[in-house]
Amino acid sequence: MSTVQVPKLNTKDLLTLEELTQEEIISLIEFAIYLKKNKQEPLLQGKILGLIFDKHSTRTRVSFEAGMVQLGGHGMFLNGKEMQMGRGETVSDTAKVLSHYIDGIMIRTFSHADVEELAKESSIPVINGLTDDHHPCQALADLMTIYEETNTFKGIKLAYVGDGNNVCHSLLLASAKVGMHMTVATPIGYEPNEEIVKKALAIAKETGAEIEILHNPELAVNEVDFIYTDVWMSMGQEGEEEKYTVFQPYQINKELVTHAKQTYRFLHCLPAHREEEVTGEIIDGPQSIVFEQAGNRLHAQKALLVSLFKNVEELS
């Protein structure tokens, strides 16, 4: 086996992409591409990852469990509602106890503050598998997918059209970190969090990225390389039927994509609500790479797990 550099990360946890430098992100992506070609590398032999879920999941649960098996370890599913934490035990106490049993924690929950406390009180790595505010593992896979298509981030233009949600937040930070241009188009009142936008703009000043928040989807996708969308109603927002009317002009369809480059690629974090945020014609079309993108969750997360768990200089 050829020598491969395991990324050295200056963080115990991954809660948001703010914690990673541009160099660390690129290294993780390159390592993920290596692991994609070499799936059965027992780099985490005997390691146990606790998987705490308070939200429904397909991609996050399966990709983390499969990733740990491929790396020689084990993923242990923990239903947050069935744990004592769901009956009043503090996050702090839970963190300290789990640190004695397992080697790392992935948590998918609602409150980002709870994940921050879990990481603070744990002596083992904590990975944010999704909160209401951030989805960093998805953004890492998104960057990997873009990088595989372009082999660069310089000069690449990404448009995100839809709800300014957790996926949008992580993409803003990701784009700013790697120096990629990103335009967001949302209906009025559904813009991304102002503080996160400010953080992305500050990072962009250092990396040469361009960040723009608009309300016109046609302007947002003008001559872009990638068009990205997500569901209009995230988990926990069900019942907000008025959003369907407000978001209809933001549907990714054959008319909207004519404003992008002819070579554009379509991205979606999935699950998709077909004929709502995107038409079947687009998501199943030749320029859609959503299933390759979904597959890259596995490889990007494996790279992250190895880097956080082993924190060593070289893999041989």
From Swiss-Prot:
List the record's Gene Ontology CC terms alphabetically: cytoplasm
Q: Which InterPro entries match?
A: Asp/Orn_carbamoyltranf_P-bd, Asp/Orn_carbamoylTrfase, Asp/Orn_carbamoylTrfase_sf, Asp_carbamoyltransf_Asp/Orn-bd, Orn/put_carbamltrans, OTCase_ArgI
- What is this enzyme's EC? 2.1.3.3
- Which domain of life does this protein belong to? Bacteria
Subcellular location, in the record's words?
Cytoplasm
Q: What Gene3D superfamilies does this protein's entry cite?
A: Aspartate/ornithine carbamoyltransferase (3.40.50.1370)
Record-listed L-ornithine binding positions: 166, 230, 234-235
Chain residues that bind carbamoyl phosphate: 57-60, 84, 108, 135-138, 269-270, 297
Q: State where it is primarily located.
A: cytoplasm
GO molecular function ontology, one term from the record:
amino acid binding
Q: In which pathway does it act?
A: Amino-acid degradation; L-arginine degradation via ADI pathway; carbamoyl phosphate from L-arginine: step 2/2
Does Ribosomal protein appear among the keywords?
no
The entry's function note states: Reversibly catalyzes the transfer of the carbamoyl group from carbamoyl phosphate (CP) to the N(epsilon) atom of ornithine (ORN) to produce L-citrulline.
The entry sums up its family as follows:
Belongs to the aspartate/ornithine carbamoyltransferase superfamily. OTCase family.
The name this protein carries in UniProt is Ornithine carbamoyltransferase
